[in-house]
Amino acid sequence: MASHKLLVHPPKALLKPLSIPNRLLLGPGPSNLAPRIMAAGGLQIIGPMSKDMYQIMDEIKEGIRYVFQTRNPLTLVISGSAHCALEAALVNVLEPGDSFLVGANGIWGQRAVDIGERMGARVHPMTKDPGGHYTLQEVEEGLAQHKPVLLFLTHGESSTGVLQPLDGFGELCHRYKCLLLVDSVVSVGGTPVYMDQQGIDILYSGSQKALNAPPGTSLISFSDKAKKKMYSRKTKPFSFYLDIKWLANFWGCDDQPRMYHHTIPIISLYSLRESLALIAEQGLENSWRKHREAAAYLHGRLQALGLQLFVKDPALRLPTVTTVAVPAGYDWRDIVSYVMDHFDIEIMGGLGPPTGKVLRIGLLGYNATHENVDRVTEALRAALQHCPKKKL
């Protein structure tokens, strides 16, 4: 028998059926799910340490190696968003007092600075205005001056729409005995990245962008150089949950019997497995081409409306997330709200430094189609006609 009376009654809202609006997600992520990926989310759960689950985990690792273009044995999934993957990289590689060089040309570089400082690293931001990118010469100056153990670059800066070139940076870092960490959250699956050939030591991505899986899992891979640094550290990582030695064992990366570490998000991993399977069936190069062609079509339609792309150099435009300069006289919030309220299409404003300056339109995975470009540009045309415009 219960010894106390209930003080909290069943919430009335939970006694009603769950209702989800039918909405087209054309922001920087998450993206709408393909039917096969949605179906995977409805499958029955199995034990996290069963042979069947281990098989699924191994298939996911092979899929990650494919989309990352790597043969690294130390390749796995982090149970958490891409922020978790970034923290996993930093908490395992950096020790207090280590020098950490960060390309801070948007919100994700700023987050890397914040996390590095929390870990007691000596953080050296290379700050750029929104829309900027890094050259080999600029990075070499930072490497020579600060002698870091780790350099962070964002491949696809979704807050600014910049695609950071990666060729040559791995070789440059290794010349200075520095590891290269790359954020590819919004780029993997949507634009070329070659982890091994570009000399990237740690690469991570998210499930909910061009890969089209639900949010909540992140992909990460470590080179042998990165593994050596992590496995020879003098102090334990601050986080047990993100300790790579435990995670490597649980994901079958160390050729040892697997030991329980935490309960993985089983249903989310079903969906991730299917998202990687779809890219494998489509072909990675075909996926890149689809995103490139959809982005080019979007850029042309936007410019036909008289809108200006925020990133001026076409070679530096991220194909998965396009940033559009907010047209003079308009409040970006009015445009975003109009497109949502009248067309059930989600686009987003800026994040971090570009807040108030840009609109962000994502063409990610399943959503990267000419039909969706037509829908969002017609919605923008209507918004520009009906939203209030201040006199300049």
Curated annotation (Swiss-Prot):
Keywords: Acetylation, Aminotransferase, Peroxisome, Pyridoxal phosphate, Transferase
Residue numbers covered by motif Microbody targeting signal: 390-392
UniProt keyword GTP-binding, yes or no: no
Primary localization class, coarse: other
Gene Ontology annotations for the cellular component aspect, listed alphabetically: peroxisome
Residue numbers of N6-(pyridoxal phosphate)lysine PTMs: 209
Annotated protein name in UniProt: Alanine--glyoxylate aminotransferase
Species whose genome carries this gene: Pongo abelii (Sumatran orangutan)
Source taxonomy: Eukaryota, Metazoa, Chordata, Craniata, Vertebrata
Gene: AGXT
